[in-house]
Amino acid sequence: MLEAGPLRLDPATREVERDGREIELSAREFALLEAFMRRPGQVLTQGQLLEAAWDAGYEQRSNVVEVYVRYVREKIDRPFGAEGIETVRGVGYRLRKDGGGA
């Protein structure tokens, strides 16, 4: 079980919840969130996120990482009035260690 504040992710059952409420994620969204939750507080580059959630030979030619990070934010942050995933301009993204607050 991975935890960051009120956010919980179980890699074995592929379940995600925040404040006790289950959150449905696609396989790719789950892979992105798992990458963040394995390294809370650490900045992950777009390359690292691509490696975590896309096939090895995938070449980024668009804003696909930005789009999927937005999808994850819309599911784990917005409904709860939280800001767990932060943009670090020019570098990448980071999941706050507190998961965006209690």
Regions found by a protein language model. Name each.
Residues 1-3:
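Basic, amphipathic DNA-recognition helix from helix-turn-helix-like DNA-binding domains
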Residues 6-8, 84:
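Short, surface-exposed charged micro-motifs
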Residues 9-15:
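A short, compositionally biased
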Residues 15, 20-27, 31-84, 89-91:
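Positively charged, aromatic-enriched patches within helix-turn-helix-type DNA-binding elements
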Residues 97-102:
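C-terminal end segment of the histidine kinase catalytic
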